[in-house]
């Protein structure tokens, strides 16, 4: 009997609740301290296994692991690629998502509008945002206005002192606009893309600085940071929905040519500019924490399903359909 398992963090509550709604047994695994969160306060886990990745026990319980950002961050891409436990999704996608140069190639292949990338900090001629590689919830991001500003902040925030240390960061043009994070689900079984929900992030300290009068901001000499602390639901202007949907379709098509396909949940992270252009910064090729806003469904999933449908439940339903049709091996790697 297949059970659905995930690392006890990030979006595990939503994933396991969705799995229960679809009739699956559930497993959370992770640090002992959080056991009661998943078994008592929010009783969504039938089993709680201690450890970052208790592989033998997961195999014994016939688990299918659902990846999250926390899971990838804790184990690392190399270990996840070697997992013996069935993994929902295409593991090949991981290296394309975690390496910003490969990610850029993917998004360019999808013909999305992207910000300029600066290979040399000395070429900075406008505001840029500097991003370390990997899924870290915005930690280590910073804004720089010039080459001099870049080097000062790179040493302060990331310990970078020379160009030889730049291989693990990306210097990206800062595009002004409204941040949006559309959440998608692509079904390998039906070949259909679904827009599940949309959010924007609440980040520390950038979203709190506006509460401080400008004069005091200058006196405090604050450094802006972008660590994600929460999420805010967003319903997009209806005339912009096709821009978002078409971007998702192109990303899936490009993935089929580059890495054998992307299926399951993913998110494009970008902004709508004042000219109503959707500029994409990066992709999260897995469930994102912004979907936690919609455990009982979103305005978009209600239009399609007429029942509560979270991204976590949609994952479980895909696995359920795959089992019923004898296609489970097609949706796990």
Swiss-Prot record:
Enzyme Commission no:
6.3.4.23
Q: Which pathway does the UniProt entry assign to this protein?
A: Purine metabolism; IMP biosynthesis via de novo pathway; 5-formamido-1-(5-phospho-D-ribosyl)imidazole-4-carboxamide from 5-amino-1-(5-phospho-D-ribosyl)imidazole-4-carboxamide (formate route): step 1/1
Q: Which cofactor does it need?
A: Mg(2+); Mn(2+)
Q: Which family does it belong to?
A: Belongs to the phosphohexose mutase family.
Q: Which HAMAP family match?
A: IMP_biosynth_PurP
**Keywords assigned by UniProt?**
ATP-binding, Ligase, Magnesium, Manganese, Metal-binding, Nucleotide-binding, Purine biosynthesis
Instruction: Write out the residues that bind 5-amino-1-(5-phospho-beta-D-ribosyl)imidazole-4-carboxamide.
Output: 10, 70, 231
Q: What is this protein called?
A: 5-formaminoimidazole-4-carboxamide-1-(beta)-D-ribofuranosyl 5'-monophosphate synthetase
Query: Record-annotated residues binding ATP?
Result: 121-181, 203
- Describe cofactor binding as the record notes it: Binds 1 Mg(2+) or Mn(2+) ion per subunit.
Chain's role: Catalyzes the ATP- and formate-dependent formylation of 5-aminoimidazole-4-carboxamide-1-beta-d-ribofuranosyl 5'-monophosphate (AICAR) to 5-formaminoimidazole-4-carboxamide-1-beta-d-ribofuranosyl 5'-monophosphate (FAICAR) in the absence of folates.
Q: Would the keyword Phosphoprotein turn up in this protein's UniProt record?
A: no
Query: Which reaction does this enzyme catalyse, per its entry?
Result: 5-amino-1-(5-phospho-beta-D-ribosyl)imidazole-4-carboxamide + formate + ATP = 5-formamido-1-(5-phospho-D-ribosyl)imidazole-4-carboxamide + ADP + phosphate
């Amino acid at each position: 009997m297949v059970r659905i398992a995930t690392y006890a963090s990030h979006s595990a509550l939503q994933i396991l609740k969705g799995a229960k709604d679809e009739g699956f047994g559930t497993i959370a695994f992770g640090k002992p301290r959080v056991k009661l969160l998943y078994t008592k306060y929010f009783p969504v886990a039938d089993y709680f296994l201690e450890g970052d990745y208790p592989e033998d026990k997961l195999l014994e319980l016939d688990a299918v692991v659902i990846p999250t950002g926390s899971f990838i961050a804790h184990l690392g891409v190399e270990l996840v690629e070697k997992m013996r436990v069935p993994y929902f999704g295409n593991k090949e996608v991981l290296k394309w998502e975690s390496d910003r140069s490969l990610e850029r190639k993917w998004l360019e292949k999808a013909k999305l509008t992207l910000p300029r990338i600066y290979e040399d900090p000395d070429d900075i001629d406008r505001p840029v945002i500097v991003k370390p590689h990997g899924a870290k919830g915005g930690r280590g991001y910073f804004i720089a206005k010039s080459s001099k500003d870049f080097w000062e902040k790179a040493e302060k925030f990331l310990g970078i002192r020379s160009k030889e240390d730049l291989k693990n960061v990306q210097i990206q043009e800062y595009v002004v606009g409204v941040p949006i994070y559309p959440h998608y689900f692509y079904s390998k079984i039906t070949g259909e893309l679904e827009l599940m929900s949309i959010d924007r992030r609440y980040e520390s300290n950038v979203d709190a600085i506006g509460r401080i009068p400008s004069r005091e901001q200058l006196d405090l000499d604050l450094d802006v940071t972008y660590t994600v602390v929460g999420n805010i639901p967003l319903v997009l202007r209806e005339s912009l929905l096709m821009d978002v949907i078409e971007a998702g379709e192109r990303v899936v098509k490009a993935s089929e040519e580059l890495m054998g396909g992307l299926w399951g949940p993913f998110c494009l992270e970008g902004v709508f500019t004042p000219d109503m252009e959707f500029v994409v910064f990066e992709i999260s090729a897995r469930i994102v924490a912004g979907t936690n806003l919609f455990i009982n469904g979103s305005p978009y999933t209600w239009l399609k399903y007429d029942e509560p449908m979270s991204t976590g439940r949609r994952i479980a339903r895909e696995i359920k359909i795959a089992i019923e049709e004898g296609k489970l091996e097609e949706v796990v790697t």
